[in-house]
Amino acid sequence: MAPKAEKKPAAKKPAEEEPATEKVEKAPAGKKPKAEKRLPAGKSKEGGEGKKGKKKAKKSVETYKIYIFKVLKQVHPDIGISSKAMSIMNSFINDIFEKLAAESAKLARYNKKPTITSREIQTSVRLVLPGELAKHAVSEGTKAVTKFTSS
């Protein structure tokens, strides 16, 4: 019996260590356990590439806000614009460009051409924008294309 008594404490030591680690890992009742952060394959916590020093790069969102502001300052230098009004103007420009792109795509499809050229854009501007606004847009667009091709 004496040898069995000596084996029991030796066998209990690993058994005692397991519940101790389980107690540490278990969260109190009513709380969810914290999920561990998973690292990408090949990266470790001790590795040279840690996330502590680097900030996550923001996803760039393209807007027309700076251009709207520049035009506003050219037309009315003393007037400002609220963020809500700027957001509305940005949505308006996105909507107009979307309509022009859709109309240009339709025109290219009707004419069985794979490419949208300045001619399709010009025609779509005439179709989408009303009267005087279309005339001004076409003249400004023609001027911009001429400037681009000459440089």
UniProtKB/Swiss-Prot annotation:
Compositional bias ranges of the Basic and acidic residues kind: 1-28, 36-51
SUPFAM superfamilies assigned: Histone-fold (SSF47113)
Cross-link (Glycyl lysine isopeptide (Lys-Gly) (interchain with G-Cter in ubiquitin)): K147
Keyword Secreted tagged: no
CC annotations in GO: nucleosome; nucleus
Post-translation changes: Can be acetylated to form H2BK6ac and H2BK33ac. Monoubiquitinated to form H2BK143ub1; may give a specific tag for epigenetic transcriptional activation.
Entry keywords, A to Z: Acetylation, Chromosome, DNA-binding, Isopeptide bond, Nucleosome core, Nucleus, Ubl conjugation
Function: Core component of nucleosome. Nucleosomes wrap and compact DNA into chromatin, limiting DNA accessibility to the cellular machineries which require DNA as a template. Histones thereby play a central role in transcription regulation, DNA repair, DNA replication and chromosomal stability. DNA accessibility is regulated via a complex set of post-translational modifications of histones, also called histone code, and nucleosome remodeling.
Similarity field: Belongs to the histone H2B family.
Protein's name in the database: Histone H2B.1
Organism: Zea mays (Maize)
